């Protein structure tokens, strides 16, 4: 298997005007502690340190770490960690938020890490637009797994010409808001099994025919290919009742 090279998928937003437009879409204040995924050349980092209490910028490229340090000489409220985000360990205590323009080719891995391996209350991420839409698609396992832990929204579509070099596709600014109640480990394993069988249309492994009809009726589902997350949760709850 070829090793993923994060550096090969780096596209930067450098225009102050475009950066300001994006920053105005997110909610940050002077009390916030932020982890930034991919400091790049420090263009967003420079805005984050002005608005937040403290910024921890994680950047895999040592040369870009130095570029960012030189850009932030007048600011004491930051640290740069030269590390691979997929190997980085987020703290499990104290409230914090995450911001990042993440590489398209490892977007799934990064988002899974944020949702399942961090305790971030809110994450603002710039991702490929098609990927953002797939995160809202309840016919996909990734979306259903994430929605159990976070609320997902698209805040803005970001045109490809904002980036240099210009990618072939548009991007989106999304927000992941942590739900108040974290799913217990045992419950999550049962939920994961349900999700995978549902997405693979293995309904007969989840319900008897009679149970399935009752579960669909209770959730008010008339088209199993077009359901809301709330309806999916209703199905899962019915599954738990039928299976003790």
UniProtKB/Swiss-Prot annotation:
SUPFAM superfamilies named in the record: S-adenosyl-L-methionine-dependent methyltransferases
A cellular component term, taken from the record's GO annotations: cytosol
Gene Ontology MF, one: rRNA (adenine-N6,N6-)-dimethyltransferase activity
Pfam families: RrnaAD (PF00398)
Statement: the UniProt record of this protein carries the keyword Transmembrane helix: no
Xref: Gene3D superfamilies: Ribosomal RNA adenine dimethylase-like, domain 2, Vaccinia Virus protein VP39
Enzyme Commission (EC) number: 2.1.1.-
Keyword list, A-Z: Antibiotic resistance, Methyltransferase, RNA-binding, S-adenosyl-L-methionine, Transferase
Binding site for S-adenosyl-L-methionine: 11, 13, 38, 59, 84, 101
GO aspect biological process, one term: response to antibiotic
Statement: the UniProt record of this protein carries the keyword RNA-binding: yes
InterPro entries, sorted: KsgA/Erm (IPR001737), rRNA_Ade_diMease-like_C (IPR023165), rRNA_Ade_Mease_Trfase_CS (IPR020596), rRNA_Ade_methylase_Trfase_N (IPR020598), SAM-dependent_MTases_sf (IPR029063)
The organism's place on the tree of life at top rank: Bacteria
NCBIfam families in the record: Erm23S_rRNA_broad, erm_G_23S_MT
Role noted for this protein: Involved in erythromycin resistance.
Family to which this protein belongs: Belongs to the class I-like SAM-binding methyltransferase superfamily. rRNA adenine N(6)-methyltransferase family.
Name this polypeptide is given: rRNA adenine N-6-methyltransferase
Organism taxonomic ancestry: Bacteria, Bacillati, Bacillota, Bacilli, Bacillales
Gene label: ermG
């Amino acid at each position: 298997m070829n090793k993923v090279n994060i550096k090969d998928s780096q596209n930067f937003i450098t225009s102050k005007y475009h950066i300001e437009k994006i920053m105005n879409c997110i909610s940050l204040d002077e009390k916030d502690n932020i982890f930034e995924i991919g400091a790049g050349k420090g263009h967003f980092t420079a805005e984050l340190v002005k608005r937040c209490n403290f910024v921890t910028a994680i950047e895999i490229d040592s040369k870009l770490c130095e570029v960012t340090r030189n850009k932030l000489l007048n600011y004491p409220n930051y640290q740069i960690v030269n590390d691979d985000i997929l190997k980085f360990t987020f703290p499990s205590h104290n409230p914090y938020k995450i911001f990042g323009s993440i590489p398209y080719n490892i977007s799934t891995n990064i988002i899974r890490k944020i949702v399942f391996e961090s305790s971030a209350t809110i994450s603002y991420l710039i991702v490929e637009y098609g990927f953002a839409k797939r995160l809202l698609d309840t016919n996909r396992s990734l979306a259903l797994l994430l929605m159990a832990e976070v609320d997902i929204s698209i805040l803005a579509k970001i045109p490809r010409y904002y980036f240099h070099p210009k990618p072939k596709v548009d991007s989106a600014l999304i927000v992941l808001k942590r739900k108040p109640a974290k799913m217990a480990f045992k419950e999550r394993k049962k939920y994961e099994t349900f999700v995978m069988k549902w997405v693979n249309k293995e309904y007969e492994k989840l319900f008897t025919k009679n149970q399935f009809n009752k579960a669909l009726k209770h959730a008010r589902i008339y088209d199993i290919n077009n359901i809301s997350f709330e309806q999916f949760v209703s199905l899962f709850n019915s599954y738990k009742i039928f299976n003790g």
